[in-house]
Amino acid sequence: MIAANPTDLEVYLFHEGRLYQSYELFGAHVIRGGGAVGTRFCVWAPHAREVRLVGSFNDWNGTNSPLTKVNDEGVWTIVVPENLEGHLYKYEIITPDGRVLLKADPYAFYSELRPHTASIVYDLKGYEWNDSPWQRKKRRKRIYDQPMVIYELHFGSWKKKPDGRFYTYREMADELIPYVLERGFTHIELLPLVEHPLDRSWGYQGTGYYSVTSRYGTPHDFMYFVDRCHQAGLGVIIDWVPGHFCKDAHGLYMFDGAPTYEYANEKDRENYVWGTANFDLGKPEVRSFLISNALFWLEYYHVDGFRVDAVANMLYWPNNDRLYENPYAVEFLRQLNEAVFAYDPNVWMIAEDSTDWPRVTAPTYDGGLGFNYKWNMGWMNDMLKYMETPPHERKYAHNQVSFSLLYAYSENFILPFSHDEVVHGKKSLLNKMPGSYEEKFAQLRLLYGYMMAHPGKKLLFMGSEFAQFDEWKFAEELDWVLFDFELHRKMDEYVKQLIACYKRYKPFYELDHDPRGFEWIDVHNAEQSIFSFIRRGKKEGDVLVIVCNFTNQAYDDYKVSVPLLAPYREVLNSDAAEFGGSGHVNGKRLPAFSEPFHGKPYHVRMTIPPFGISILRPVQKRGERKQNEEEVHRHVIGRRARKPASLADEKHRETSRAVWGEVPDH
């Protein structure tokens, strides 16, 4: 139960930057006790001369509803002796120079539908969750050696009703979940759902950090959506923006007439690129606000993780000719990750960082930032640049494919083809591909196949699964009419089977963060733009051979070295006719020959598809398996397992072991 008045300990921890449930102190809370009921409001406004409560319950006249100042640091509170659930409200703040500001509650749990901006008293309690099996399953598995394919989407533009209205959170549970499950995705990632005034910002310029946007329903409706996802076996990750916020007059900006949540120095405060304000990450009260917010989404909405947006904008001071590290941001991110993993060691904390900042996913006690995953922006940019290169010129850009393996194990990576790559004139993924209509599809199938075979978890933005031709338009739904066209249907089928193949074979994901899981067979064939490599699982002898051809030239009887003396079966070929390809496949088992080639004792002769990927798997009899496992063991002996980055500092080492487990040396 919420106390009628803030406790001294709560207030102290808030001002120390260590009140991680500050949402229990601030905001609007219905309180009950002794047969009475009331509603407590609490707000932080350190520069205010006076604060009044206004709303639909007092005709927006705060004369008789002044808040009491709790301390000199600006905590104000009032208890209204009524149950005000469902009522609109704002804070009327009198600044030191006498100006009157009407502000929404920074800790509001629900807000009016835009363009209106009032906060709404809402009791979050009362929803009955049914996701206990999902939570138990999460605790049993280490996330690092599990398959992960994320479906990234914008809630308002995935699909719309015939009259153009949004689907609600509850309606989307029926529409979205079966679609995502049918294609085999393991998680969905939602562009920001905090309350935000402008649709065009996609949610990245928010101001109501504790208020799930009312565009699609109520907080309980969103709980229902997440609950349904978990019951279906889908994880839910949300985009979260702790670096900057919108400057609309009703929001956080100059909250009490002076810089409150933002930096005092204008050069540090103003984010001129996005037209927003940067959070003052050195201010303890702001840290309490933001870290509590992450824990709030975990506690009340059961989300499984966060993709932390624009980490580079936090790590470096903005608006400087040279890049200077922001020590407040570094300390904040470490404190954030420690707090999150102390709460739940199975959370996904994903950094969207475009810089080469070292050790983003390394332990905080060892100087790292403490995330457990990072988007691999370097791989994404190199691969898209390579694929946009005319095929006959790709031999001159060969290292754009191979370079990523030089740093693939420096962090725990996710390979993203995200919303950022299909907007602002960048073209859709399909339209980035050069060549004819059919060649565009072939190369996109190849690109997706290579992404699945490359070390790292995977992310694909909505519409890419059926090769949307146009860029993403936030105000329109996806081009579902494309399912009327054969190659788009076949692309969708290919993505289904590709993800199923990825999830079926453990070498694709078990050693994503261990160098033993990948080995080049031939990385030097620039002339033909052909790459071949091995992916390995934890079990000795569990291997896949992958061959990628980035030109339109097919090859027969092509020699590829293999690690085991066994026949090989092609488990997937992107050029299969069922996917819209030309049919250059390996329909029969491929025998391995005992002739050394490319540093291996064996090789096969196979068909290489044009603009295609072929995935081979050895077919072994039980008697052969032990012998082959011994050969593989001899080959990899001495290659050392890399322990994925742990996350806690010295005082959280026990939590760290719970997160990562023990990885033995080899």
From Swiss-Prot:
Keyword Transferase carried by entry: yes
Presence of keyword Transferase: yes
Chain segments carrying region Disordered: 622-666
Keywords, sorted A to Z: Carbohydrate metabolism, Glycogen biosynthesis, Glycogen metabolism, Glycosyltransferase, Transferase
Active site: D309 (nucleophile), E352 (proton donor)
Listed Gene3D superfamilies: Glycosidases (3.20.20.80), Golgi alpha-mannosidase II (2.60.40.1180), Immunoglobulins (2.60.40.10)
Comp. bias regions, Basic and acidic residues: 622-634
Organism domain of life: Bacteria
EC identifiers of the protein: 2.4.1.18
Gene Ontology process terms (BP): glycogen biosynthetic process
Temperature-dependent activity: Optimum temperature is about 39 degrees Celsius.
Reaction equations catalysed: Transfers a segment of a (1->4)-alpha-D-glucan chain to a primary hydroxy group in a similar glucan chain
CDD domains: AmyAc_Glg_BE, E_set_GBE_prok_N
Subunit description: Monomer.
Function: Catalyzes the formation of the alpha-1,6-glucosidic linkages in glycogen by scission of a 1,4-alpha-linked oligosaccharide from growing alpha-1,4-glucan chains and the subsequent attachment of the oligosaccharide to the alpha-1,6 position.
Family from the record: Belongs to the glycosyl hydrolase 13 family. GlgB subfamily.
Designated name of the protein: 1,4-alpha-glucan branching enzyme GlgB
Gene source species: Bacillus caldolyticus
Phylogenetic placement of the source organism: Bacteria, Bacillati, Bacillota, Bacilli, Bacillales
Gene: glgB
